[in-house]
């Protein structure tokens, strides 16, 4: 029997193992059910860090994740994202040739002294595909300048595009002043924002992201290894993303790895040593995979529930979600998950539009709601004909009178 609370109706549905649930932050391990037996977050030797699940977006661990820090060459992740978006839009192709200008020549630019380079020379004609690898694998500052000039006409214009995407992605603690990440006043980011840029790279420009797993690149007879040492770690399936270092920034690393269908992204900023940033990132990723799992309980178009509809050309409405639901939960707790839904009103009246929000799905663990998603109409339901609506009106009156 339905119980009405302030014109909202709650219907409890015990879900089978097909249903799962939400996020529990590892930063609050005390809130976990004791049978989960999740130890605390490992001690991480860095100024700031974060660990998120790629699909659910849930934060599993964090410390000083919103503190603004010098990103160093993590900046190149946004450079790469802008390039990937431009190629996705058809503005240029990997086979296009880029003529290298003087501003991308290390010898003529003292700011490049001692920094990571692809070793370009003025007048060279280099395919976009090679410059991208110079950025993503070799962390070449000269390659960043060459691609910025080619893609936007100037470095300043390209930086403007970078900051436009900062706004579009909703990043709260990031602003870029350079295309390469060398120290500059007013340039900053945070561990959280860098993890979100990594998430955007994987989601929005997968062709661009696929380059990050390549372990080496040779240009003009100079062979350089990918600076992300975790690519060689056989205990993790790491396929990206980017390192960064300046004296001011310390040692930074954003890394992503998969285990089955689960993908995690870690961001470590202000690490102490070159190898230390890898060790700390590995701690986070290993801990996340060992003690959490991400499940996909509801898919777009799959009916979660159905409800009677009044005054429509259909008697019932199929209800579900308008996008796939991913939930990150303590490993082994899926069997304990339940779900319920709440309608925004006690009755559904036609017309109803496809994807119209009519309520909320609550995912529950140990009796607590730990995640929510909008409950939507899966198919449009127009108004019924005149006689059908009259009949529904009479039925509804009896329903109100006699319950």
From Swiss-Prot:
It comes from the Bacteria. GO terms for biological process: cell division; cell wall organization; peptidoglycan biosynthetic process; peptidoglycan metabolic process; proteolysis; regulation of cell shape. The keyword Ribonucleoprotein does not apply. It is an enzyme of class 3 (hydrolase). Its main location: membrane. Its EC number is 3.4.16.4, 3.5.2.6. Substrate binds at residue 242. The active site is at residues 73, 76, 139. Pathway: Cell wall biogenesis; peptidoglycan biosynthesis. It is a peripheral membrane protein. It catalyses: Preferential cleavage: (Ac)2-L-Lys-D-Ala-|-D-Ala. Also transpeptidation of peptidyl-alanyl moieties that are N-acyl substituents of D-alanine; a beta-lactam + H2O = a substituted beta-amino acid. GO terms for cellular component: outer membrane-bounded periplasmic space; plasma membrane. It is found in: Cell inner membrane. Keywords: Carboxypeptidase, Cell inner membrane, Cell membrane, Cell shape, Cell wall biogenesis/degradation, Hydrolase, Membrane, Peptidoglycan synthesis, Protease, Signal. Residues 1-29 form the signal peptide. Pfam families: PBP5_C, Peptidase_S11. One of its GO terms (molecular function) is beta-lactamase activity. The keyword Protease applies. Removes C-terminal D-alanyl residues from sugar-peptide cell wall precursors. This is D-alanyl-D-alanine carboxypeptidase DacA. It comes from Escherichia coli (strain K12). The gene is dacA.
């Amino acid at each position: 029997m339905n119980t009405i609370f302030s014109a909202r109706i709650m219907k409890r549905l015990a879900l089978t193992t097909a249903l799962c649930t939400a996020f529990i932050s590892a930063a609050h391990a005390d809130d976990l059910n004791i049978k989960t037996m999740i130890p605390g977050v490992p001690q991480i030797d860095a100024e700031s860090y974060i660990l998120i699940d790629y699909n659910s977006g849930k934060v599993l661990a964090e410390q000083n994740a919103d503190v603004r820090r010098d990103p160093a060459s993590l900046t190149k992740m946004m450079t790469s994202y802008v390039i990937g978006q431009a190629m996705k839009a058809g503005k240029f192709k990997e086979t296009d040739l880029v003529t290298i200008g003087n501003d991308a020549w290390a010898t003529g630019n003292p700011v490049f002294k001692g920094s990571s380079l692809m070793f370009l020379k003025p007048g060279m004609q280099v395919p976009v595909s090679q410059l991208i690898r110079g950025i993503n694998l070799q962390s070449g500052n000269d390659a960043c300048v060459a691609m910025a000039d080619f893609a936007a006409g100037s470095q300043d214009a390209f930086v403007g595009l970078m900051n436009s995407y900062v706004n579009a992605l909703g990043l709260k603690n990031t602003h870029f002043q350079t295309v390469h990440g060398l120290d500059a006043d007013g340039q900053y980011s945070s561990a959280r924002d860098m993890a979100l840029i990594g998430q955007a790279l994987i989601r929005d420009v997968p062709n661009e992201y696929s380059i990050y797993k390549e372990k080496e690149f040779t240009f003009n007879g100079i062979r350089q290894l990918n600076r992300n040492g975790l690519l060689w770690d056989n205990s993790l399936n790491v396929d990206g993303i980017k390192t960064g270092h300046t004296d001011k920034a310390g040692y930074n690393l954003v890394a992503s790895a998969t285990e089955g269908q689960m993908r995690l992204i870690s961001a470590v900023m202000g690490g102490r040593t070159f190898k230390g940033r890898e060790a700390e990132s590995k701690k986070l990723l290993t801990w996340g995979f060992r003690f959490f799992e991400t499940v996909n309980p509801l898919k777009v178009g799959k009916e979660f529930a159905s409800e009677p509809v009044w005054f429509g050309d259909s008697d019932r409405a199929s209800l579900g979600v308008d996008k796939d639901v991913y939930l990150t939960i303590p490993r082994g707790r899926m069997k304990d998950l339940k779900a319920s839904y709440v309608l925004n009103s006690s009755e559904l009246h036609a017309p109803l539009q496809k994807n119209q929000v009519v309520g909320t799905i609550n995912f529950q663990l140990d009796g607590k709601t730990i995640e929510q998603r909008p409950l939507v109409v899966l198919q449009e339901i127009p108004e019924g004909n005149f006689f059908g609506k009259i009949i529904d009106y009479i039925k509804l009156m009896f329903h109100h009178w006699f319950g």
